[in-house]
């Protein structure tokens, strides 16, 4: 009976409760909060008017910009990890024997809502960032190996194109599908035993389609949030970024975070 209760509660946790608190935590937009606390100004009123790292650097400097990046990355790591801790220690990591489904994979579901909260924060009139750093944090929890490849990919594309927005969109799309490649799709909270991971790829495949879908939704939202950047790139009006310095022209649309 306890096992059945834990299984039911695990579904309620991962599909209802986790998305709720993940969205609320995601809505705590670091750039807006930091700019209001330390500068008494809303970063969304200046420059690109975007609530993200790049605009924070442009408006308030590198220190607050880097702190914004760190806090945005931490948000999905916190929400997914919190869900996993509750799932494992409070509910004793139940396994739905009725269909052979390992519910551990569902702890990642809330990560999507962290990104949604960041982009559409309830605390700030649903006007948030574009989800790049949050997507990166989510990817770290889903697959650290692919996340590392993603960081390298982002930097290489940025060095070549000088467009942060384009680099972010390409990297998100690339990493989303890269998790499907056997051998590098290690999912920490699902494949808990790293030493046996490579000897049971069939087990990996059972869960990878779920996280792939979660990442696909997240990457699609990220790209959608960059719709103005896509237009700016097409008309050659997008701002160019050189690491933490930006080249700008008058009346250009926002870059990305």
From Swiss-Prot:
UniProt-listed Enzyme Commission number(s): 2.3.1.275
A UniProt-annotated Pfam family: G3P_acyltransf
UniProt topology in membrane: Multi-pass membrane protein
UniProt GO cellular component terms: plasma membrane
Keyword tags: Cell membrane, Lipid biosynthesis, Lipid metabolism, Membrane, Phospholipid biosynthesis, Phospholipid metabolism, Transferase, Transmembrane, Transmembrane helix
InterPro entries: G3P_acylTferase_PlsY (IPR003811)
Main location: membrane
Any one GO MF annotation of this record: acyl-phosphate glycerol-3-phosphate acyltransferase activity
Lipid biosynthesis as UniProt keyword: yes
Function: Catalyzes the transfer of an acyl group from acyl-phosphate (acyl-PO(4)) to glycerol-3-phosphate (G3P) to form lysophosphatidic acid (LPA). This enzyme utilizes acyl-phosphate as fatty acyl donor, but not acyl-CoA or acyl-ACP.
Stored NCBIfam families: glycerol-3-phosphate 1-O-acyltransferase PlsY
Name this protein carries in UniProt: Glycerol-3-phosphate acyltransferase
């Amino acid at each position: 009976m306890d096992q059945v209760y834990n299984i039911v509660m695990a579904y309620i946790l991962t599909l209802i409760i986790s998305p709720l608190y993940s969205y609320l935590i995601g809505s705590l937009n670091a750039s807006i909060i930091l700019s209001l606390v330390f500068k008494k100004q809303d970063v969304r009123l200046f420059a690109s008017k975007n609530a993200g790292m790049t605009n924070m650097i442009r408006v308030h400097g590198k220190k607050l910009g880097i702190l914004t990046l760190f806090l945005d990355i931490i948000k999905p790591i916190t929400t997914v990890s919190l869900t996993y801790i509750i799932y494992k220690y409070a509910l004793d990591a139940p396994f739905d024997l009725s269909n052979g489904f390992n519910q551990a994979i569902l702890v990642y579901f809330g990560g999507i809502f962290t990104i949604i909260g960041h982009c559409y924060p309830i605390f700030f009139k649903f006007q948030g960032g574009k989800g790049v750093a949050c997507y990166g944090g989510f990817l770290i929890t889903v697959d650290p190996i692919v996340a590392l490849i993603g960081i390298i990919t982002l930097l290489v594309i940025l060095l070549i194109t000088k467009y942060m927005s384009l680099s972010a969109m390409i990297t998100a799309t690339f990493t989303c599908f890269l998790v499907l490649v056997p051998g590098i799709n290690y999912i920490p909270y699902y494949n808990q035993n790293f030493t046996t991971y490579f000897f049971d790829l069939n087990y990996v495949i059972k869960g990878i389609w779920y996280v792939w879908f979660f990442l696909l939704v997240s990457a699609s939202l990220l790209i959608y949030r960059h719709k103005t950047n896509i237009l700016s790139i097409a008309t050659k009006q997008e701002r160019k970024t050189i690491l933490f310095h930006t080249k700008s022209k008058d009346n250009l649309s926002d870059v990305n975070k």
